[in-house]
Amino acid sequence: LTCLSAFLLTTTALAQKTYAIITGVSNYEGTANDLTQSTKDAKSLASLYKSKGATVVLLTSQNATRANVIAAIRKVRNIATSNDRIVFSYSGHGMENIICTYASTSSQMLSYNELFRELDQCPAKDIVCYIDACYSGTAANNMHSKNFVSANEKAWKNIMKSNPRYIVYLSSRSSETSSESPLVGSGLMTNGIMKGLRGKADSDGDKNITAIELFKYIHKDVQLHNKRQHSQLVTSKALYNNVLMSW
């Protein structure tokens, strides 16, 4: 009995927890730049992760400010362990090197540099990011090594060797816009993520969705709707078979 109790305690201690920070902005200040799907996308993804037992922080529209996003990451940082998974998701407008969190000027928005600097400090086993925004490929210029070295002049392979925890899905190349579609009812990449994690990406039928399975599904699905949008996966090959979700 004592040995069994010790085994159960050890198993519980080692169980990986998932902490998800899900953000989406449809309604910006004024009405000229509003979107139709981003807030809904964030809520749908948050619901999916909650159904799988994740601890979720959901920030949408006026609550999805730069300050609130950073505060949420820091809160998770204080409770996550080196065995846990952190998920960060953003749906909304994007500019070069910036995700358009709720603000009146770009200087008040969250840069990719800031985002990855905050995530770098989280003690997680792996960090999964979904960024569904125009020009999201520019995130490639803003990731860091463990010592927060700027990645502007480094190849992705060197970045991943330096900090091989990231599994990053970007909705488009650095020069491309990203689409949302009322007909699809979602941003195109987020639509692929939702369908993929719910089982569509399970190419080998083992009920587990791996990082590479999800990417292959997303890329193909987005291309069906928009040939000019190319989703990107940035990760180490060592993480290709990490299970993102079981269904």
Predicted regions and their residues:
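Bacterial N-terminal signal peptides
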Residues: 1-10
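Cysteine endopeptidase catalytic domains of the caspase/legumain-like
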Residues: 11-247
